[in-house]
């Protein structure tokens, strides 16, 4: 439900903040483009908008895994989402 999505988005915001601080010098411009989007997620009021943007975060995590993170480090977060 929507409350669960919001809780999950809050977790992702915290987690991504940690990732950004660790890999700030490594992330390329394309990945940095998602930072502002993640910051806006709390403002979405509809389930569809939240889910659409959650999919963008999932895409970002895949890019991070392929570029700067150990494989599978975040996969378990998404097993039950989609």
Regions picked out by a protein language model, each given a short descriptive name:
Residues 1-48, 52-66, 73-82:
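AAA+ P-loop NTPase domains with strong preference for DNA replication initiators
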């Amino acid at each position: 439900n929507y409350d669960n999505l919001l809780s999950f988005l809050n977790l992702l915001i915290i987690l991504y903040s940690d990732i950004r601080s660790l890999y700030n010098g490594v992330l390329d411009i394309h990945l940095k483009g998602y930072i502002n989007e993640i910051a806006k997620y709390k403002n979405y009021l509809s389930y569809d908008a939240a889910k659409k943007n959650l999919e963008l975060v999932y895409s970002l995590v895949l890019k991070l895994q392929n570029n700067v993170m150990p494989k599978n480090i975040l996969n378990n977060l998404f097993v039950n989402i989609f």
